[in-house]
């Protein structure tokens, strides 16, 4: 069990992620929110940011540093902290819009549908138990070296895919290739290979990081 902090981005202010400015002894600092202090104290928790595409642009901008650097205010959440977000598609989200491109590029996007039979089973207390595969540090490091050569070779042959901004409005707020998201692919594939995950899962991770076209 890992500590979980759920934050509804749609009802938050920028300072709930960027920190509250305060002046003490002639210097300014950013006081981190309570959820950040709780996660930092734990060191291995999960931040679940819900409804991020109904958060105003100023809040989405404040989320950038949290997502990439794992820093809220002046507080580091710790390398062991994981960040997960959820959003309904803009066409069905109430007052929703596409994610800003800088924020969208900081996530692996996975479309999630909950089967009716799973919901029915969960209503009577039978939610499925999921076993998370394990991998050793040595295996991950080995796979990282191997995948880095594969990825370098691919981008050398397809340099136009190193960075490709979304070309249509339908792709706004989704995954697209940049050096940052290719690094996501490298790390995800290294872990997936070390865990012996199925090919279809690896495909979802790649598409979720750099988009369908890449």
What are these regions (language model features)?
Residues 131-214:
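Alpha-helical lid/collar subdomain of P-loop NTPases
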Residues 1-150:
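AAA+ P-loop NTPase catalytic core and its hallmark functional loops
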């Amino acid at each position: 069990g890992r500590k979980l902090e759920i934050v509804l981005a749609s009802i938050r202010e920028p300072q709930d992620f960027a920190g509250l400015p305060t002046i003490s002894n002639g210097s300014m600092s950013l006081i981190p929110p309570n959820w950040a202090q709780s996660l930092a104290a734990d060191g291995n928790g999960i931040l679940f940011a819900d409804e991020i595409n109904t958060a105003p642009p100023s809040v989405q901008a404040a989320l950038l540093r949290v997502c990439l650097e794992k820093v809220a205010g002046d507080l580091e959440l710790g390398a062991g902290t994981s960040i997960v977000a959820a959003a309904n598609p803009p066409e069905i989200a109430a007052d929703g819009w596409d994610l800003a491109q800088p924020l969208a590029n900081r996530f692996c996007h996975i479309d999630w549908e909950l089967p009716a039979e799973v919901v029915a089973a969960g209503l009577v207390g039978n939610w499925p138990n999921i076993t998370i595969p394990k991998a050793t540090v040595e295996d991950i490091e080995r796979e990282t070296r191997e995948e880095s050569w594969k990825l370098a070779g691919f981008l050398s042959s397809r340099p136009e895919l190193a960075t490709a901004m979304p070309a249509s409005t339908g792709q706004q707020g989704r995954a697209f290739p940049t050096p940052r998201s290719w690094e996501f692919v490298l790390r995800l594939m290294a872990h997936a290979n070390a865990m012996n995950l199925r090919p279809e899962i690896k495909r979802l991770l790649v598409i979720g990081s750099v988009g369908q076209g890449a």
